[in-house]
Every structure is written in C-alpha cells, then in structure tokens.
Amino acid sequence: WVIGKADSTKSKTRKTKPIWAGIELGVNSYLDNKGDFNLADGKENFELKLNKSVSFSLNFLQKNVQLGHSNVWFFTGLGVTWNNYRFDDDIKLSNGNFTNAYHDTTAGVSHQKSKLVASYLTAPIMFEFFTSRKYKNAFHMGVGGTVGLLIGSHTKNKVEIDGETKKLKDFGDFNLNPFRYGFRVAMGYGRLNVFADYYASTLFKDKKGPVLYPVNVGITLVGL
C-alpha cells in the first residue's frame, strides 16, 4: 500500500452484508392461544388500533460472519426496541397479581386514549442469503430469530377529569415477560429490507395475564 495510490485489493463496488444496524419501523399486533387476531374469551378489551400500534427500533451494533466464500452470512447484534400497543377501547391496565384491561368508572373521569409501551434490548440470531455480492442488484432473504430483555414498560392514558384533559403515565412491569424469544424472516433488494417477527413467548407471564403472542412486521429504513 502506497500513499496516494488506490488499494487494488479493495473492490470499487460495496459488497453485500446483512442488514440489521440502522432504524426499523413496524406495526405491532398479537395472536391469541388459538392463533386468531380477533380476540375473544374475555380478551376483547385488549384489541388494538393497528395504525397506532407502532414499533421503533434503533439497532446500534452488528457482527457479520461470512460462511466461507459463499453468499451466506451469519449475523448477530444489539438494538433497542420500543413496542407501542394502542388499545382500540379506552381502558386501563391493572398492575397487580394478574394483568387485566378494564373500564374506569370513576365519576368525573372520561378516558380518551390508552396504550402500553414496552421496551426491550434485542439481539438477532440470523442467517442471510444473497443472490449477488453487490448491493445494487442483490436480492436477499434471512431466517432465524431474535431474543429480547425487557428494560422498561409503562402505560399512558389520555383522560378528561372534571373537564380538564390530562396525560397520565403509570410505570410498572404489568406482569410482562422479562425475556422474549421468537422467529424472524426478512427479505429485500439492495438496501431495502422488510421483516416479520413472531414471538413464541407470550407477552405476559404465565398465568399472570391473557395468553397473547406478539407479532411485528415492518421495514428497515436505514442499513448502516
């Protein structure tokens, strides 16, 4: 290598690598124990407004390992994910021995909006295949899973109390599972990437809340 001369060993075209580090936006939902999005059997109050139930992820660390000289990569990393579950009905979540959704009947109090926010430290364990080694014309598909550690949670309610509008936050674990794990599939072309997550762990602890399996679909906006 000589100063002022190009390094001939480096390709002028950026090679492919898995897309994880960056920003993700998604939509949250969940399935009941029958695999149904339409909730019944006492879970109706947990129905969501999908257009308001958004997720945001900031994935700040990524480690790639190419399998030999193939177009297959293994990768892992770290990120922080914020999951917003905006309830279709204006309810409150109990924060006791069992998490339930109920209507507040306190006189003079009118609920207008209600949501649960849960944040996780997230790590992928994925394999990704590319049809080319160049970003601009590479179709890619990834399969694997993600694991997450709960690092914060709260509810947010917009209420009207005696004619005055207030936003109330209640911090607690709401019997959320402290650890989650699930499956991820991802595909895309070039720098564009879409993904879908299904969690095999329930949103709430066993026998501490309704049986709900989180689902998340979205897009990677920036691959760093």
Where are these regions (language model features)?
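Residues on the lipid-exposed face of transmembrane beta-strands in outer-membrane beta-barrel proteins
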Residues: 23, 27, 56-64, 78-80, ...
